[in-house]
């Protein structure tokens, strides 16, 4: 490298004028692009050897300063080359990573998101269908429950009516029982009356017989004995006929009353038995309907509990799906932001690379110019054109870059600026 520096220093003599013409504000580290206008200096007709010593001294001084400047430039150039290589490697790595992200990850993530979204939508549709089915079943059960409640109300009304009828039948049975007891008491009183009348009749008959016997004895004693046997027989026959007719009438009246009371009691007993049978049937039906109602209430409570659980589970799953969707959207947004950041970094690296390429090209032009002017004698430059190029880079879609290029040209003569022009190229796609 030292040998290269010395050789480069020996080859060029006019670089001092170039560097001095740039001035302290135009250091080469700012990387402007220089273009030197072609000059044709006038050749002297004679060579004045009296100036050789002064020229040799100036030449040595110039060569020393040129060597120092060239060594510094070579060091800076080497460091820039290494930096460019490092940045190119990083650029390649980032470009490969960016291409990989563009080629694979978005598609894979999009497929994953689409699959998860399809699955979540499918599960949401299933849950919606299940919820609708459960609502229909709930409505059906509610309708069945209303029907059963109406039936229960009807059966309750029938039971109340049967209980009212049973109470009426019981009252009638009680009245019939009271009537039967009254009739039995009347029958007993009539039997007692018959017995009393019979005793009275027998007593009267006995007294009459005694009277007849006394009259017969008295008659036999006083007068002649009349024919009283026939009269007595007739009287006895009359009394026996009257007593027999009274007994028959009393027995017939008793039998008719007893038959009527027996028929009424049997009818009332049959009605009571039917009422008891109907009450037992109603009681069994009421028990069965009560059991059915309790079973339906339990089924309704179970279905309502299942429906609430389904609604709560549906709400939880919907909330989890919404959270998953929000999380996926956040991840997608973060990935987009990360990709945008990578693109921005890649753009910044491209800008740095472009600036370094411009700087390298500037150094290459300088070195080539120095090597091409190795055979030109020492002269002063009367004209110097300085061209500066600035870039404003914009990123466009689909991986292309759009830049604004500004070219500034400064023409100098004898250290004075005689022309300053500026040209701008907008939206140049690269």
From Swiss-Prot:
Span list, region Linker 12: 212-227
UniProt-annotated stretches for the region Coil 1A: 70-101
Region of interest called Linker 2, as start-end residue ranges on this chain: 250-253
Gene that this sequence comes from: Gfap
Span list, region Tail: 375-430
Modification Phosphothreonine occurs at: 7, 40, 107, 147, 380
Listed name of the protein: Glial fibrillary acidic protein
Organism: Mus musculus (Mouse)
Record-listed Citrulline modification sites: 33, 267, 403, 413
Phosphoserine, modified sites: 12, 35, 79, 266, 320, 382
Domain of life of the organism encoding this protein: Eukaryota
Pfam families, A to Z: Filament, Filament_head
Stretches for region Linker 1: 102-112
Spans through the membrane: none
MF terms (GO), sorted A to Z: identical protein binding; integrin binding; kinase binding; structural constituent of cytoskeleton
Disulfide bridge map: none
């Amino acid at each position: 490298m030292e040998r290269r520096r010395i050789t480069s220093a020996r080859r060029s003599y006019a670089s001092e004028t170039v560097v001095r013409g740039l001035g302290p504000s135009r250091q080469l580290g700012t990387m402007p692009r220089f273009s030197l206008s072609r000059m044709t200096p006038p050749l002297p007709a004679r060579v004045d050897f009296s100036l050789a010593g002064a020229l040799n001294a100036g030449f040595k001084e110039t060569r020393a300063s040129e060597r120092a400047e060239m060594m510094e430039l070579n060091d800076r150039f080497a460091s820039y080359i290494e930096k460019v290589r490092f940045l190119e490697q990083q650029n390649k790595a980032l470009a490969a990573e960016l291409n990989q992200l563009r080629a694979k990850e978005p598609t894979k993530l999009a497929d994953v998101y689409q699959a998860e979204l399809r699955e979540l939508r499918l599960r949401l549709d299933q849950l919606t269908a299940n919820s609708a089915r459960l609502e229909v079943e709930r409505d059906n059960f509610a309708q069945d429950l209303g029907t059963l409640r109406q039936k229960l109300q009807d059966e309750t009304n029938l039971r109340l009516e049967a209980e009212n009828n049973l109470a009426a039948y019981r009252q009638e049975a009680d009245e019939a029982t009271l009537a039967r007891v009254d009739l039995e008491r009347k029958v007993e009183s009539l039997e007692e009356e018959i017995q009393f009348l019979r005793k009275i009749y027998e007593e009267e008959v006995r007294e009459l017989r005694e009277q007849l016997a006394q009259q017969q004895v008295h008659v036999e004693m006083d007068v002649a004995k009349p024919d009283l046997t026939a009269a007595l027989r007739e009287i006895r026959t009359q009394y026996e006929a009257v007593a027999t007719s009274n007994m028959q009438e009393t027995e017939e009246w008793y039998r008719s009353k007893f038959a009527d009371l027996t028929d009424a009691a049997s009818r009332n007993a049959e009605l009571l038995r039917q009422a008891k049978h109907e009450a037992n049937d109603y009681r069994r039906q009421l028990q069965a309907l009560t059991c059915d109602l309790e079973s339906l209430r339990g089924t309704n409570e179970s279905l309502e509990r299942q429906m609430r659980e389904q609604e709560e589970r549906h709400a939880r799953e919907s909330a989890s799906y919404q959270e998953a969707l929000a999380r996926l959207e956040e991840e997608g947004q973060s990935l987009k932001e990360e990709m945008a950041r990578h693109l921005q970094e890649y753009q910044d690296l491209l800008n740095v690379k472009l600036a370094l390429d411009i700087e390298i090209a500037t150094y290459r032009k300088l070195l080539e110019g120095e090597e091409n002017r190795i055979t030109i004698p020492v002269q002063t430059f009367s004209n110097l054109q300085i061209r500066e190029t600035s870039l404003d880079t914009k990123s466009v879609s689909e991986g292309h870059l759009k830049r604004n290029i500004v070219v500034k040209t400064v023409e100098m003569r004898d250290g004075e600026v005689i022309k300053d022009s500026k040209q701008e190229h907008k939206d140049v796609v690269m």
